[in-house]
Amino acid sequence: MAHEPDSQTVRLWGGRFSGGPSEALARLSQSTHFDWRLARYDIAGSRAHARVLHAAGLLDDAELAQMLRGLDQLEADVASGAFTPSPDDEDVHTALERGFIERVGPELGGRLRAGRSRNDQIATLVRMYLREEARAITALLLDLVAALADQAEANLDVPMPGRTHLQHAQPVLLAHHLMAHAWPLIRDIERLRDWDRRADMSAYGSGALAGSSLGLDPEAVAAELGFSRSVPNSIDGTAARDVVAEFAFVAAMIGVDLSRISEEIILWATKEFSFITLDDAFSTGSSIMPQKKNPDIAELARGKAGRLIGDLAGLLSTLKGLPLAYNRDLQEDKEPVFDAVDTLKVLLPAFTGMVATLTVNRERMAELAPQGFSLATDIAEWLVRQRVPFREAHEIAGACVRVCEERGIDLPDLSDADLAAISPHLTPQVREVLTVQGSLESRAARGGTAPARVREQLAELRKAIDDHRAFTQSHA
C-alpha cells in the first residue's frame, strides 16, 4: 500500500514515479530520528551554497538576501524547537527544505537545490559534525589526563609493586604508573588531531557523484564551512566513509584505554589490594548488601569499551562491499559514530571525576612494593655493574630467590654470610639496591621510574596538556 504524505511533505525525488513509496519503505528509509542532530550543519551548508549560486549568477542580490533571511529564521526555529521534523520527512535534508520553503515560498525555496545532492551534503555535514565533536572529546580527554597528572603529583614519592602478568615484578613509583595511563590518552588526542587533517576536506560541489556543471565554486563553500580545501575527486567525496570509520576507531581506542585503567581501579579498590578508596559520589551500593561500595564507573567504562568496539566493527562491516559511488547502505554510517560520540561524552566526565577524587592508600602500596622478590632484578643488574656477565648474574639472583623461598624470608633479610655463600660476587655493597628507594633511584635513564625522571616526565606531560588545549579552541 502506497504511503500518502500530507500536502506539506517535501520529497527530493519522484518525478519519474507514478506514486509515492509504500508505508513500509517510507518507515525503513526515515532517518530523522538520528540525523536531526545535523540540522545546524545542514543550514550552514545551505548558506554557503546560496552564496556560490549567487556568485555563479544563478541568484540575484535580492534572492540571495531573502534566502539568507529565511535560513536565519529556520535556524532560530530549529534551535528553539519551533520547527521539528514531521512524521513524513524522510531525513534531515527534506525536513529542512520543507521548513525553508515554508519561510520563503516554493519558487525561491526550490532554487536552493540547484547544483547539490544529498550525497555531497551528507558527506560534508558528517565531517563538520565529527570535527566539532573531536574538539569536544579532546577537551574531555585533556581533563582526564590532567586528573591523572594531579594524582601523580600528589603521590610523587609513593612506591608500589610494578607488575607483569599481574605478578610482582619491580618497584615503581605510583606517579610513574599513573602517567603510563596518561600517555596513551595523549596519543588518542594526537590521533584525533591527525584524523582532523584528513577530515578537513569539504565534499560540497561533488553533486551526486560527477560534480557540478553550474559553475559553482567548491573551494568557496569549503572555506565558509571551516575546511581548508575541497575534495579532489567527486566520486571519492560522496562515496568514501573512511573518515567516519577512522573516527570510530579512535573512539574505540579511547574506550580500550579507559577499560585498561578501569580494570586496575576495580582491582585496586578490592579488600585484597586495598590500594585506593573511591569517593562516595563516584561509587554505588547494593540493593541487598549494605556494606557494598561498587566501582560502577570503572565497570561501566569497561563495558562501554565493548560497545565502542562494536560500533567500529559494525561500521566496517557495512563499508566492506560497497561499489562506487554512493549506496544507500551509507545511511548506516551515522548511528554507530553518533553512538560513539554520545558514549564518550557521557563517560569521560564521570571517569575524570572518579580519578580526581580517589584516595590512595600510600602505606599499603609501599608495604607491598618490595614483596614478591621484586628486587631480584636489581641484584642481577648490580652484579652486571660489577662486570659479572648477565647470564651468570641472572643465575645468582635466581639462587637468592630460591634460598629466600626455602627459608621463608625476603631478599633484604639475607645476611652478608648468606649472600657470600650464594656467590662471592655478592659483597655487602649489594645492599645499596636491596631497598625500594635504592631500586627506584637506580632507574635513572629517560623513561625510568627514578624520582628525578618522574618529575621530569610530569613536566613533560603538563606541557603536552597545554599544547593540545589550543586544538580544542580552534575552529572546525
UniProtKB/Swiss-Prot annotation:
It comes from Thermobifida fusca (strain YX). NCBIfam families: argH. Its main location: cytoplasm. GO terms for molecular function: argininosuccinate lyase activity. InterPro entries: Arg_succ_lyase_C (IPR029419), Argininosuccinate_lyase (IPR009049), Fumarase/histidase_N (IPR024083), Fumarate_lyase_CS (IPR020557), Fumarate_lyase_fam (IPR000362), Fumarate_lyase_N (IPR022761), L-Aspartase-like (IPR008948). SUPFAM superfamilies: L-aspartase-like. It is found in: Cytoplasm. It catalyses: 2-(N(omega)-L-arginino)succinate = fumarate + L-arginine. GO terms for biological process: arginine biosynthetic process via ornithine; L-arginine biosynthetic process. CDD domains: Argininosuccinate_lyase. Belongs to the lyase 1 family. Argininosuccinate lyase subfamily. Pathway: Amino-acid biosynthesis; L-arginine biosynthesis; L-arginine from L-ornithine and carbamoyl phosphate: step 3/3. Disulfide bonds: none annotated. The keyword Amino-acid biosynthesis applies. The gene is argH. Keywords: Amino-acid biosynthesis, Arginine biosynthesis, Cytoplasm, Lyase. It holds the Pfam family ASL_C2. This is Argininosuccinate lyase. It is an enzyme of class 4 (lyase). Its EC number is 4.3.2.1. One of its GO terms (cellular component) is cytosol. The keyword Lyase applies.
